[in-house]
């Protein structure tokens, strides 16, 4: 069982101290190197064990699973291993949705994935076959014809499977325990003022807001309005997946509030302005709802957005141009 690694605590004073001409680049470098060391540690363990054929990477939304997985694949390849990424996001089917009491569709549960196909493809890869995986378009929320080349790892390569449900029984159950390594990735941190400002869930929400605006054609109030569904669904799986993991990777970067808070504040402000002018676009997450309304609870979302504004205005800002091109933050910034 993995244990949550040491929680990172950053104060507003710490963030202000980082902003010096020389201090910020050095602090960014230390934070990024810490994350790289996590990846290298996992890669070393997998590469040194010839029995390992699969790495399962799990974690809640906006934890950096994709970037971590891509880096891990690269690290394994650098150690002479043939390795590929298999993303469970491409196996969304959305054929049978459930809903919460306010009409939010559940896009987070394992039932929204075609786990039968994912398990077949994974088994074929491990056996040495070449596989063309499906493609899911998050803008249209539909599976589209895949144009990706087939992937293969031969008889001794490694598949790195990533997704919220990367450690579910449907994926791990076909393998002996010695054949795979489990990784649970999640930011585990708090940003402090006189009392706590932001916790780990808030940090992920801000990452998700920034990503949804830039990657998925959504505005900030859409993400905030849908967040209760994300939280409730994750609670059903969180402990089980952490228990099955061998490692917890803390994906929080100590300098990230300087960048993410600034962008999220801008995104929230634009959404609230549109709301007040009566120009707010309906939530893309409610398009498949079982009730006919544009948002699950827009009043609650607006109240949360205004609270976030108060918190985020206390955090000093740095431009996203300071973020290295290889940073996990680029998964959310779309740089």
Task: Name these PLM-found stretches.
Residues 1-41:
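Charged, amphipathic alpha-helical linker segments immediately N-terminal to NTP-binding catalytic cores
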Residues 5, 26-29, 174-335:
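Conserved NTP phosphate-binding and transfer environment spanning the P-loop NTPase/kinase superfamily
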Residues 55-57:
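Hydrophobic anchor at the beta1->P-loop junction of P-loop NTPases
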Residues 62:
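Walker A (P-loop) phosphate-binding loop of P-loop NTPases
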Residues 65:
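Conserved lysine of the Walker
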Residues 74-84:
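Post-Walker A helix-loop "phosphate-sensing" segment adjacent to the P-loop in P-loop NTPases
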Residues 84-87, 93-144, 158:
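Conserved nucleotide-sensing/catalytic segment adjacent to the nucleotide-binding pocket
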């Amino acid at each position: 069982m993995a244990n949550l690694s040491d929680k990172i605590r950053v104060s507003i004073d710490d963030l202000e101290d980082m902003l010096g001409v020389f201090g910020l680049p050095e602090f960014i470098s230390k934070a990024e190197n810490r994350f790289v060391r996590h990846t290298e540690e996992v890669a070393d363990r997998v590469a040194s064990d010839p029995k390992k054929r699969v790495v399962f990477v799990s974690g809640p939304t906006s934890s950096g699973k994709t970037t971590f997985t891509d880096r891990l694949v690269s690290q394994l390849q650098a150690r002479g291993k043939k390795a590929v990424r298999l993303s469970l996001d491409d196996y969304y089917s959305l054929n049978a949705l459930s809903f919460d009491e306010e009409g939010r569709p559940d896009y987070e549960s394992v039932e929204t994935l075609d786990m039968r196909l994912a398990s077949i493809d994974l088994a074929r890869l491990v056996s040495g076959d070449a596989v063309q995986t499906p493609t899911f378009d998050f803008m249209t929320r539909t599976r589209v014809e895949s144009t990706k080349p087939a992937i293969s790892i031969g008889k001794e390569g490694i598949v790195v499977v990533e997704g919220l449900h990367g450690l579910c029984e449907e994926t791990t159950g076909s393998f002996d325990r010695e054949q795979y390594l489990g990784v649970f990735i999640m930011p585990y941190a708090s940003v402090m003022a006189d009392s706590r400002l932001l916790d780990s869930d808030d940090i992920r929400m801000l990452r998700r807001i920034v990503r949804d605006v830039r990657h998925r054609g959504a505005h900030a109030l859409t993400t905030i309005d849908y967040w209760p569904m994300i939280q409730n669904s994750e609670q059903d799986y969180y402990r089980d997946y952490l228990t099955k993991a061998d490692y917890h990777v803390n994906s929080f970067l100590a300098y990230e509030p300087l960048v993410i808070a600034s962008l999220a504040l801008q995104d929230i402000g634009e959404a609230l302005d549109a709301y007040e002018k009566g120009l707010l676009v309906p939530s893309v997450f409610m398009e498949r709802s079982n009730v006919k309304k544009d948002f699950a609870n827009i009043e609650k979302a607006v109240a949360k957005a205004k609270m976030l504004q108060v918190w985020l205005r206390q955090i000093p800002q740095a431009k996203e141009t300071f973020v290295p091109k290889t940073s996990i933050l680029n998964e959310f910034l779309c740089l």
